[in-house]
Amino acid sequence: MAERYTAENLTFTRSGRTLTDNVSLSLSQGELVTLIGPNGAGKSTLLRLLTGYLKPDSGGCSLAGKALDEWHPQTLSRYRAVMRQQSQPGFDWQVEEIVGMGRAPWTRHPEPSIVREVLQLTGCLPLAGRRYHALSGGEQQRVQLARALAQLGVTERRAAWLFLDEPTSALDLYHQQHLLRLLKSLTRQGHLHACVVLHDLNLAALWSDRILLLHNGRIVSQGIPETVLQADALAHWYGAQVHVGMTSGARRTAGFSRPLA
């Protein structure tokens, strides 16, 4: 399995509006990349294009030099998983069964040992035995992360590509840090790539290996956090005053103060 997931000249238009405008990028194993930008910048659309859930008007994506639509869906699902903003299955299964769904590309038989290992890894073991629809929004997000990791077989340290759309939106502060710390730990092992849509610039600053800043469907800045998170640039693209500081002299942190007049 090649170590790159690439997109070339992606353009996507809907209702006369260009949501993704000639975007090219390359994603490597062993890194955590975040997509940031104001509302309407095209972050979620780009994520859907990267994963093949949307078809671009022009351009395309490839894994291991092979276009996504040339992969057999079951085989592709062994290497690429997606965690959406919201996921409400039409059946009220127990947590273990929801996580076990992630193993569908591999087997039709239950794999309780793998499910339990992933539940432990994601801090979801206390949720075992509960009905999915009875969980809070944050608990459901954590279970969906466990499902995606089970799908990719991350406990087996395989090449894998995980795409997450605002995975921290319903989480409290502790679980936001836990989720991103886990992703960082897994990517550092060198097998997993994580591409994450985030609105919280502070989280992006603290955990990203690389940041892509989008505006009006284009990548307007990309690089390490120290390069992208510049106060003047963020104020320009977000239309708000931004405070940028340093933590331990190494990592930038960014927070909004007030909109620009």
Swiss-Prot record:
Signal peptide (from-to): none
Family label: Belongs to the ABC transporter superfamily. Heme (hemin) importer (TC 3.A.1.14.5) family.
SUPFAM superfamilies linked: P-loop containing nucleoside triphosphate hydrolases
Major subcellular site: membrane
Protein name from the UniProt record: Hemin import ATP-binding protein HmuV
Entry's Gene Ontology molecular function annotations: ATP binding; ATP hydrolysis activity
Name of one Pfam family that matches: ABC_tran
Oligomeric form and interacting partners: The complex is composed of two ATP-binding proteins (HmuV), two transmembrane proteins (HmuU) and a solute-binding protein (HmuT).
Protein origin, superkingdom: Bacteria
Record keywords, A-Z: ATP-binding, Cell inner membrane, Cell membrane, Membrane, Nucleotide-binding, Translocase, Transport
Binding site for ATP: 37-44
A GO cellular-component term linked to this record: plasma membrane
EC id: 7.6.2.-
Membrane topology, from the record: Peripheral membrane protein
PANTHER family: HEMIN IMPORT ATP-BINDING PROTEIN HMUV
Segments forming domain ABC transporter: 5-241
